[in-house]
Amino acid sequence: MDRSSLLQLIQEQQLDPENTGFIGADTFAGLVHSHELPLDPTKLDMLVALAQSNERGQVCYQELVDLISSKRSSSFKRAIANGQRALPRDGLLDEPGLSVYKRFVRYVAYEILPCEVDRRWYFYRHRTCPPPVFMASVTLAQIIVFLCYGARLNKWVLQTYHPEYMKSPLVYHPGHRARAWRFLTYMFMHVGLEQLGFNALLQLMIGVPLEMVHGVLRISLLYLAGVLAGSLTVSITDMRAPVVGGSGGVYALCSAHLANVVMNWAGMRCPYKLLRMVLALVCMSSEVGRAVWLRFSPPLPASGPQPSFMAHLAGAVVGVSMGLTILRSYEERLRDQCGWWVVLLAYGTFLLFAIFWNVFAYDLLGADIPPPP
């Protein structure tokens, strides 16, 4: 239903005789029932919230159109937020007789979304198609690649110390910068079982719920942006080092989620959030510390520099900038967000600088690059 159709219906029913552009919430609720307009339970709750945000308990036509068509602009979301005290605080927790999958969807809603209105919106509108295939596919591909190289080299821990491992066409190496695919494909290779296990666990525990809520397009964009930023940052700041592992993408997802939790601390309803926040920060810091130790104090003799840790840090920066913008724009068009264009411009500027650096700076600076394996 568009605005003109709604206006025609209201005029036919003489629900706004003075043509104010507003209609009472109770009056519109009666219109919904009499004409069977497509409003599910969460939209009816939002209708109450919209009415609460208005001193006279009325709603403007455009907000009603947004409500019916499921479009959520920034102004629409602000109006909902102003009146959301009318909603029960823990409404979804009291839903009886849910299936196992629906209980999981409810769990995801409380883990990821900071607002009761958003949680209800997601819970009632969630569909199983398309499924969250991106994070699961990436994790499966990483495990398959690891098993193939582990079986071939008969080495499962610290694989990068094997001379044949770094010859893989997937690894990013500064001597192979012209092979542009390596700036992304290094995410399928890992130092060993310890790094793969850490990344796979976070991708499934955090990445899959984020993908369920925000969709495959946004989460895949964030993950790949973190991966690309990781290799490009290494090519600028640690010019002699190769890179392996999906840590750039993992840290982009985790940093975005943690930043979103912190900025919406009061609204998040996940249990033990302080303890879990501390545990997540300790684990992420420990992984960075392990990567720094392997880079500068390798425990085994190696034929060249070991993988850099800068991809972790670059991914975290992408997460708290681009990622936070994405997560805070749930069910809103990113192109309508001013902050999104600022972040996109900054990321594009970084890409152009990194490309220029990789094309010209190595020769101009006379960088001592180790020979490619």
UniProtKB/Swiss-Prot annotation:
Keywords: Hydrolase, Membrane, Protease, Serine protease, Transmembrane, Transmembrane helix. It catalyses: Cleaves type-1 transmembrane domains using a catalytic dyad composed of serine and histidine that are contributed by different transmembrane domains. Its EC number is 3.4.21.105. It is an enzyme of class 3 (hydrolase). It is found in: Membrane. Pfam families: Rhomboid. InterPro entries: EF-hand-dom_pair, Peptidase_S54_rhomboid_dom, Peptidase_S54_rhomboid_met, Rhomboid-like_sf, Rhomboid_IM_Serine_Proteases. SUPFAM superfamilies: EF-hand, Rhomboid-like. It comes from the Eukaryota. The chain crosses the membrane at residues 131-151, 196-216, 219-239, 243-263, 275-294, 307-327, 340-360. Its main location: membrane. One of its GO terms (molecular function) is serine-type endopeptidase activity. GO terms for cellular component: membrane. The active site is at S247, H312. It is a multi-pass membrane protein. One of its GO terms (biological process) is proteolysis. Belongs to the peptidase S54 family. May be involved in regulated intramembrane proteolysis and the subsequent release of functional polypeptides from their membrane anchors. This is Rhomboid-related protein 1. The lineage of its organism: Eukaryota, Metazoa, Chordata, Craniata, Vertebrata.
